[in-house]
């Protein structure tokens, strides 16, 4: 597919930055937004779903929403230093850890040690742990006590494709969201908007074929309840 010359990868350029940007996850977005408005924020969020469904993207949106200096009603749409830093993974109070490469108890203990200090510039210190099911048993045990009784300023956001590999003691202490597969019609409209904005030279029939292939890939991805 030909697009105008652009130094920024389209997947990054059009990555959702707010809850309103998400497609196919309206219930999740509304539930989280309402709970934040009501000041009923869980100690930990747990997002489950197939690869590429948007777990890490939503995790960052949650982190931005919790720490947006313009408030929840703004929905991160007005320029905010906290939101910009979180979006670029540069915020000192929002740490992301890939549990696929950092599985050990020492990695978790480093997080716990860091959690002892309050946030520097944001309202909450937030730890986003991707592929959390990859943590070792010892790492989960080390994490559990902090998860049970975290300081008020600390929030966890977990993402996983393998919910069954996470100890029930951890799952039970999270607010869990199972992300839905995106409908083909919604995906088509999303890609078409990008094509139009980028003046892409591709027909709607070709776009439908791309969506069909993407849907087949997602169907082949097993669902893990």
Model-derived regions: residue spans:
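Conserved small helical "lid"/interfacial subdomain of P-loop NTPases
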Residues: 183-203
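Residue-level detector of conserved catalytic or cofactor/ligand-binding positions
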Residues: 215-225
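P-loop/Walker A NTP-binding region and its immediately flanking N-terminal helices
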Residues: 1-176, 185-186, 204-205
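A short helix-loop-helix "switch/interaction" segment in the helical subdomain of ASCE P-loop NTPases
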Residues: 205-216
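Aromatic/hydrophobic pocket-lining residues that form π-stacking "cages" and hydrophobic walls in ligand
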Residues: 59, 191, 210, 219
């Amino acid at each position: 597919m030909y697009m105008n010359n652009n130094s920024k990868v389209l997947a990054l350029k059009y990555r959702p930055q707010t809850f309103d940007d998400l497609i196919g996850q309206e219930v999740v977005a509304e539930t989280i937004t309402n709970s934040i408005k009501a000041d009923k924020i869980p100690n930990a969020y747990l997002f489950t779903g197939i690869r590429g469904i948007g777990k890490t993207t939503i995790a960052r949106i949650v982190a931005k929403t919790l720490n947006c200096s313009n408030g929840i009603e703004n929905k991160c749409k007005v320029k905010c230093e906290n939101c910009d830093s979180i979006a670029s993974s540069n915020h000192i109070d929002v740490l992301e850890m890939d549990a696929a490469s950092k599985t050990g108890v020492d990695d978790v203990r480093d997080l716990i040690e860091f959690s002892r200090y309050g946030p520097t510039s944001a309202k909450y210190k937030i730890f986003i742990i991707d592929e959390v099911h990859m943590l070792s048993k010892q790492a989960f045990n080390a994490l559990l006590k902090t998860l049970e009784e975290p300081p008020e300023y600390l929030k966890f956001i977990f993402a996983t494709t393998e919910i069954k590999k996470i100890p029930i003691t951890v799952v039970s202490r999270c607010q869990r969201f199972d992300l839905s597969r995106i409908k083909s019609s919604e995906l088509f409209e999303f890609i078409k908007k990008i094509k139009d904005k980028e003046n892409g030279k591709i027909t709607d029939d070709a776009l439908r074929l791309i969506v069909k292939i993407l849907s087949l890939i997602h169907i082949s991805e097993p669902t893990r309840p």
